[in-house]
A protein has these predicted regions:
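Nucleotide/phosphate-binding catalytic cleft detector across ATP-hydrolyzing
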Residues: 1-165, 173-225
Length: 225
């Protein structure tokens, strides 16, 4: 009864916690936030700059440009948490930004995770979200979330295929009858494309470029055809 009452005053939130970008959607309002999964901290203390607000776009602007005392961290690697405390700080910032500081009741949160992660890695996501301010946390496998979002008939007795290329992982899944029949997750994805472009530019043209330039090249001239 109490949980139902709290639900009337809180929000239901979906989070796509990616290696490169994090998206936050709120029920009835759609996607409210799409920002880089980057946090700027002071070296030695891991204190998030700007009173905990140097996250997302603000932090990404510091990538490759930060002084020696500041580090721009991406707390997820290959689709999983590599820095628990920084992930917690990042989630806390994104939840606050998406829901507004005035809300008293913490949100219920669904988080999309790679299908191939371990039980320990899932536990890390749950703990980070709870410590960041979520009232209840549920996990859904990314291929399933992608299939639902794309409007595929995943609940019907027919096969639907999803290829989800993220920043740290690529997932290929076949779904039918609201279940994943088979799925393969490989830790080769967008970040590796960016790195390959950087190496190619250096080797072929003796030109050094940064992560943001490499990503822009990938987006503007890349093709899946």
């Amino acid at each position: 009864m109490l949980d139902r009452l709290l639900g009337w005053f809180s929000v239901d939130m979906g989070i796509d916690l990616g290696t490169c970008n994090t998206l936050v959607a709120v029920r009835g309002e759609g996607i409210l936030l799409n920002e880089p999964s980057v946090v700027a901290v002071r070296k030695g203390t891991n204190r998030v700059l700007n009173n905990g607000n140097a996250v997302g776009y603000q932090a990404k602007e510091m990538l490759g440009k930060t002084p020696g005392s500041i580090s721009a961290i991406r707390p997820l690697k290959d689709g999983v948490i590599s820095d628990f405390e920084i992930t917690e700080a990042m989630l806390s910032y994104f939840i606050r930004k998406a829901t507004g500081r005035a809300r008293i009741i913490s949100p219920r949160v669904v988080i999309a995770v790679p299908s191939g992660i371990t039980a320990v890695e899932k536990r890390a996501v749950l703990d980070s979200a709870e410590r960041a301010g979520a009232r209840r946390v549920y996990l859904v496998e990314e291929p399933m979330a992608a299939g639902i979002g794309a409007g595929l008939p995943i609940a019907e007795p027919t096969a639907s295929m999803v290829v989800d290329i993220g920043g740290g992982t690529t997932e290929v899944a076949i779904m039918s009858l609201a279940d994943i029949a088979t799925c393969e997750s490989v830790r080769v994805a967008g970040d590796d494309f960016d790195e390959a472009i950087i190496h190619h530019m250096k080797k072929t043209y003796n030109l050094t470029i940064g992560e943001q330039t490499s990503e822009r090249i990938k987006i503007e001239i890349g093709s899946a055809a």
